[in-house]
Amino acid sequence: MPSTRQTYPVEFKGGLVTNMSPLQQGINAPGSARVLKNFEPSIEGGYRRIQGYTKYNSSIIPPYGNPVINGASQSGGTLNIANIRTTPVVGDTFKLTHATAQVNNTATAVVNGTVSSSTNVAVDGNVGSIVVGMTVTGTGVDAGVTVTTVTDQNNIVVSSAQSIADDVTLTFNAPDSDNTTHIVDTVVGTIKAGMDVSGTGIPTGVTVSSISGSTVTLSTGLDLAEDLELTFSDIYTISSGGVSYNASERTAALTFTPTIHADNSPSNGDAVEFTSTASNYLMLGCGVFLDRVIVAKNDDLFKVSSSDITQINVPSYGTVLVNGASQTGSSLVVDGLTSAPQQHDIFKIAGVDKIYRVTADASVISGGATLAISPALDSSPADDAAITFLSTSRESAGKTRFARYNYTGTEKIAIVDGTNVPALYDNTTFTALNDVPTDVNGASFVVNFKNQLFFGKSNLLTFTAPYTDNDFTAAAGSGTISLGATITGLIIFRQQLIIFTETSILQLVGNTIADFNLQPITLDIGCVDTDTIQEVGGDVMFLGPDGLRLLSGTDRIGDFGLGNVSKTIQKEVTSFISTNTSFASVVIRNKSQYRILGYNTNITQENAQGILGTQFAGQGGEGMAWAETRGIRAYVADSRFYQNIETIVFGNDDGYLYQMEDGNNFDGANIQTTFATPFMPINDPRVRKTFYKAFLYTDPQGSVSFDMSLKLDFDQKDSIQPTQINFANSTGQVAFYGTAEYGSSAVFSTKLLTLFETQLIGSGFTGSIQFESDSTDPPFSLDAITIEFGINTRR
């Protein structure tokens, strides 16, 4: 018989550990984990289920840039487009805007002359537009009266005879109290049933159910603001064999369904917005900049917010105008240039049909140039006709990286992609550095160090003159350093520029070219993957050939016996490195956490792997606690703390930019978690224990549900195990300060259950507690557990 009951408390800490034998781990680290997926070691204690992610913007990042209509008067089932640098494919869908309008749900006017049993009403003092279908209210007006005819804004006809005094104020409203029917005015184009509707605050998927005169009925009830701009579009799908792409001209001819009605023939230069793609395209880079994110996709760059996406690789050459009338052929004389247009720039000309491409770099003299163009001019432009540049080439870009800086009081971001010239962007103007030296053209890395931009290309490190971002003259303080090995990463650390190669780590100290000094940190350890380098908690984490390492450790102990900080999960790291073909990393600063995320085109989103580490000690690897992630599929990622808000974003090949640490699910999908303690011998592995009860201490952020299982004797094959136990922590509705409204149905006296007590059934020599959840519940922490047991006979 078992003896008197005893208790065994376990504090959950230490993270994932897999480099110990099961019994060693159970004896020496009972609070650690043998499995820890989608839980994070928390700086507040315990293991916390990770937060989810959501779409940063509900639309896909445009895969083909900002293509436009190439030639007016097109209709039917074919369409020529231009300013497209990647070929569309069969099955892609795109949207054409065919009409715009403003919401005009409310208007007022004053009766101008007594109305006596008449349907004719004269008004003045109008505010807003009166349109047919509006309901009319005011003193003396019967219920249900509507406007049937608008002769003009001062003379209307209503649906029944009325007697209204002079100077009575009348109010005109859209007739639908459910807000599916709205009145619109200032209509441009033709609105038709079935069209897609977009505008500020309108969710995706809203369409036109019907239209009668100025009254538009929508598929979804919406409360639309007065004067809101509405856009009405049709969605088209590219048919089989429906793409003819001209790579040299950056144009395409599309065949699609349904057809474009002649009434909705688009104008030259109108936008063609692709809404979905049949093929996947990798996001090549994402960099948080101010309150937006700069995203590289295929051959273009975009500025993305939660509500809009704007192409930024649009050159700014000044106010460019046609210089002289009667020009024809394949050249165009222009003036007003502040810099030289480049080959493959794309532009349109006011008053001239078609879209045009610059076929050779221009030479500018006194602001003027003769542009070589294709195709030949469709017609002769007028003198001083405006030239509008649509995009400049960023073709064949590789992984795109960014550096933020501010030398003049204006925030800027530098952009490199390993192929094209570097570019600068200040949230308004995009500048390609077309005149950089060969050693900078095609740079793969860029950082801001000592108020100079440093560019890494192959084995060369080139820097601008101090406080400049485009001066590469030696006399001004620019220079180039040869490293003798290919650069794999750059980072600023402790007022030094740290330079990584595959086999060494170097540091550049000093302030200017006059005292810059390159010194080795180590010559036999390097970084094998560029995008794993991050500063976290006063150290620099990076992926070495045998695992994750900390630069501070290297700096302190030189070249001898450098151990990696991920040795406690060496098996998982080795598998992670071998399974994935590319890596991205981010730092979550308020958690002192580093995340490295793997990418492989053959691994689905739900199986995408990652490793996270939380740093508990001030510096060094001794305080790192690890866990694994599943379901965060990232090819590129970035994080930044700006104006007290930390933004963490990532992207892959599904078209969307995602925001990490946002929400309770993975973009609508459940978060699946597992945490299993070691197999604990509880004092003596040779003595059988009978398990009676468990007390689980948690810290939830809302109503949650999860399962707990007791696994006995190393869960050996064919062994009988106790059934799992389900925990749910809410006995009623729950409200949190700041999120619930007074007067709602929330019960403020209801508290979340944080201590769970449950009976245990089973006996064995060792025991492990396993927790699992598969839900969209809010995050929760598992802090500690106390197990009641009795001792039986010795084995």
Q: Predicted regions span which residues?
A:
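Asp-box/WD-like beta-propeller blade repeats and closely related beta-sheet repeat scaffolds
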Residues: 426-447
